[in-house]
Amino acid sequence: MSMANKKNKINFLCSECGDDFPKWNGQCPSCKEWGTLSEFKVIGKKRISKNDYRAYKPLNDILKEKPGDRISTSIIEADRVLGGGLLPGSLLLLGGNPGVGKSTLALHICSGIQKPVLYISAEESEEQVAIRANRLNISSDNLHLSSENELEGIFNHIDRISPSLVIIDSIQTIINSDLDSLPGSPSQIRDCGQKFLETSK
């Protein structure tokens, strides 16, 4: 792929509303909060040659490949909500208040999938997740645990394992070191989410 990097630039990000600006202000021009702008580095965009654009396919050719074969979670209600199971290439956000059981549900889904699964738990160690899984009577040779919170490290795990499902618990704790901002900031969540989406496709 032939690409030429443009020069990186400095912007200022509001920690309240997530808007960014080319110049620093004491007050955010968007949400009017004071002292919320902090400096972050914007990585220059890459120029892509015409030969590097994504290919296209005729609809009938795609249908011949039988897309949409979903992966069952082995949980009837979860499969029903998901339209029959997990759709390969999709990115799903599991939301809810703290303590409602998001991580527990994610572990149960992982245990029911008969293919390699990668569970990234940046909030807990591998041992803590394993103890919780044992308490829930969850045991699986297909489930791989990691407490990695660096985006590049997560992608290295994905390359090695080639999992059919990746759980990120949670995206607020993941950091892309190319960005000069803290984990959980709007710029980090937006950038990491976009890269996870591109990878899932």
Locations of regions flagged by a protein language model:
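Helix-to-beta-strand junctions that scaffold the AdoMet/dcAdoMet cofactor pocket
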Residues: K201
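A sequence-composition feature that detects small, non-aromatic residues
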Residues: A4, A55, A78, A106, ...
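Walker A/P-loop
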Residues: S103
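Conserved inter-motif catalytic segment of the P-loop NTP-binding fold
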Residues: G89, N97-V100, H108-E198
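Detector for small/aliphatic-rich hydrophobic stretches
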Residues: S2-A4, N8-I10, D20-G95, P116
